[in-house]
């Protein structure tokens, strides 16, 4: 009588595992590059949103630009927007989600956003601001550094923290 063999041999299983590892070695770096590109696109979009929110804040409250990122955030509960909680950006971008207070730093999509009121007059009116977007983990969450100010121009640098002298972002 002949013995019937069922299942896979060890060699067949090793070949399947090797093929899966080769496919993973090709796919994972592409996936990471895609994630970096998505984070960088999100950072640029967030800077555009913050620039628009700052102009809206200045026009709406007639007090210049906001003193903090938190002032651009949503009002607590169902309260109406006020100068300290204008409701122009979400709680993540305003920093409220991280600190539960008026923040000058927030984090979103692998980037840290640092807000700095740059020029204040005698009445306390903020006439200029700077926002820096830096990767939380350079090379992993993003490779470019971004900067914007009250001019609305977004600038980038791929080697160091961006500033007003760096080249503007194309598009």
Located regions from the model:
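Regular, well-ordered alpha-helical segments
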Residues: 25, 33-36, 40, 52, ...
């Amino acid at each position: 009588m002949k013995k019937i063999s069922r299942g896979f041999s060890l060699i067949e299983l090793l070949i399947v595992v090797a093929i899966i590892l080769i496919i993973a070695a090709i796919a994972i770096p592409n996936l990471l590059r895609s994630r970096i590109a998505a984070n960088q696109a999100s950072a640029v979009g967030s800077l555009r949103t913050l620039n628009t929110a700052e102009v809206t804040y200045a026009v709406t409250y007639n007090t210049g630009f906001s003193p903090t990122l938190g002032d651009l955030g949503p009002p607590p509960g169902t309260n109406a927007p006020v100068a300290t909680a204008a409701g122009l950006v979400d709680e993540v971008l305003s920093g409220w989600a991280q600190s539960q207070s008026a923040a000058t730093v927030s984090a979103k999509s692998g980037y840290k956003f640092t807000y700095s009121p740059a020029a204040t007059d005698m009445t306390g009116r903020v006439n200029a601001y700077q926002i820096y977007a830096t990767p939380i983990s350079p090379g992993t969450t993003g490779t470019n550094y971004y900067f914007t100010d009250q001019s609305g121009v977004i600038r980038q640098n791929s080697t160091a923290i961006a500033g007003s002298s760096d080249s503007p972002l194309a598009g």
